[in-house]
Amino acid sequence: MPQSSRYSDEHVEQLLSEMVNVLEKHHAPTDLALMVLGNMVTNLINTSIAPAQRQILARSFAEALQASIKKADKAH
């Protein structure tokens, strides 16, 4: 999603691969996978971000998600 990151592509891809493997291991359909990932994002925001910043971060995350979907739609 972000244009630049302090994390290496390799590290991001490794975590992504491991998370996909867990979802596949549990044969999670798309709706369940999205629900679990959404709950994970909510938990991270609520436990790791100061209350005053939560809405701003959630909005920014949602905008980045929408932008990445639009970008993927144009590529197909």
Swiss-Prot record:
Disulfide bonds: none annotated. Signal peptide: none annotated. Belongs to the UPF0352 family. HAMAP family: UPF0352. This is UPF0352 protein ECA2748. It comes from Pectobacterium atrosepticum (strain SCRI 1043 / ATCC BAA-672).
